[in-house]
Amino acid sequence: FRSRLQLRRTQGTSAAMSADLADSKFTIPVDSENKAKSLNIFSFNFPHHASFHMSWMGFFVSFVSTFAAAPMIAIIREDLELTKPNLGSAGLAAVTGTIGARVLMGSVCDVVGPRYGLSIVLLLSAPFCFCMSYVTSAAGFLICRMGIGLGLATFVACQFWMSCMFNGKCVGLANATAAGWGNLGGGVTQFLMPLIYRGMTSATEGRIFSAWRWAYLVPGLLHTIMGVAVMFVGQDLPDGNYKFLHTSGQLEKKSALNTQYLGIANYRMWCMVATYGFCFGVELTMNNIVAAYLYDQFELDLVTAGTLASCYGLMNIFARSLGGVISDTMSLKFGMRGRLWTLWVVQTLEGILCVFMALAKDSLATTILFMVLFSICVQASEGASYGIVPYITRRALGVASGYIGAGGNAGSTICMALFFTSASIATYDGIMYMGFTIIGVTLLVVPIHFPMWGSMFFPGDPNVSEEDYYIAREFSEEEIKEGLALSVQKFCQNSYQERAPSMRPVESSEAKV
């Protein structure tokens, strides 16, 4: 059995390379899985780049709505008479409610596809945006923030979709850019919602407690529009939608229980769950607290605090993509080991800068400087993380993406509960403690080891192939005979580039497109 896999590996390389030129229905270079080999952010080419734009816009909308309360919190807490524990609990609810939703979303993507997953979660969370206009108590505020926060599960569909549409040579960049531009909503909402609030205040003749409620209609409408657009315009895979491919026999009908087991049994996934909890989880936490921190610590007005706070999220314009680019570049030079080193270095630097931001509590200018540098490392760590995630498992990619994405929310829940809910801990102290925690948790990158590629400190085993890891480990011999592993075989061939350069197959000149 093992020798048969080795034979497939040596015979499949040239076939996979020639397949790049075989399918003429695409106007851009694709690999043997019909995945795009490059990302052009200015292209709307269907289906690859159209999916890219729909995925990031759907995720962007969920971020805008989830953190819409943060820049208006000074008005909301006065209207609803909220205490610091009330605000902390609501912030927790906004990011905690989606933990289960993200785990579930992974299986949804594996079984029915990312298009349905992204669309349905946007439409289900839209009513909570509208209901925020009718909230009159702390309990109602908490429930609505939790319901709106479910929209953050769109992240899993976003990353799954990109991993299905883009080749390993640019998957880090595609994942990072789509997620980064989506996360940008957390920065945009910091200045967008105060502006909408100001406009509504004028429209309601100065009734400030009505103005913030009317402002919430905008996120609700955005959810509805994007949910419908993704449902009727998007496409799951380069070759078509899940339903068609299942019916035609071109795509395996996956068992949700089997894919759950494959994901849960992979220890690499759990290491990434923890580390992602302290990059994306930190971003969620900062989106919840930074505007109020600047407002209270430096006695700023609402719009100024929101505008400065938006600098944190606005780094997503380039910083998460930067992490993906560095990960892809290091992979070309050093293989998977380069990706792992990138994540550890950038995320450790994130923790150090977080501590420096806390120590700068007496200077607004220094606080903003370290906040921006800290933010860049946070987003870059997220981009570097999802340069690794697509390689943890192939058959259970959705499950792995779901759990790791949920780890981000779990990390935010832990940070909010430990450092920013108790009235006895000053916010700047909470930020400092969070920085030290980031540095410690990031050490979990060290034990991540791929048998064929190695880890940070140890090389891979040349006697172990990609087929051994992705096929022999995840499929039974009967399933292989039935042809269920054929699509994964193509993925294995396209993953040879994650080896150390000296171990990669030599491409013929005609195959280099």
Where are these regions (language model features)?
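Cytoplasmic helix-loop-helix junction between adjacent transmembrane helices
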Residues: 144-182
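Residue-level signature of mid-helix packing/kink "hotspots" within the transmembrane helices
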Residues: 67, 94-103, 153, 187, ...
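Extracytoplasmic gate region of multi-pass secondary transporters
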Residues: 69-73, 265-323, 382
